[in-house]
Amino acid sequence: MKILAFFIFVLLIFSCSSSMIMGVHYHEYRCHDWVDCAIWCKQWVPQPKCINRVCDCKPKSLPTNEEVPQSAYSSNSNY
């Protein structure tokens, strides 16, 4: 009985230390596609990317003036 309790204690210590080494949220970032990241990243981006099995929660950057097509400006020039 003491050996079983000791074995469980050692497993508990090992599991806690390995999660601390890898990081607290290690498993939350692992993914296969963007759907796996949706719950974790929903507060930052509506459809996150899964790059190399890791969730990318960075929001898309806003387009610069060079990236905006001219048709977007022509509709506002009538005012």
From Swiss-Prot:
Coiled coil: none annotated. It is found in: Secreted. The keyword Disulfide bond applies. Its main location: secreted. Keywords: Antimicrobial, Disulfide bond, Fungicide, Plant defense, Secreted, Signal. Residues 1-19 form the signal peptide. GO terms for biological process: defense response to fungus; killing of cells of another organism. Disulfide bonds join 31-50, 37-55, 41-57. GO terms for cellular component: extracellular region. Belongs to the DEFL family. This is Putative defensin-like protein 309.
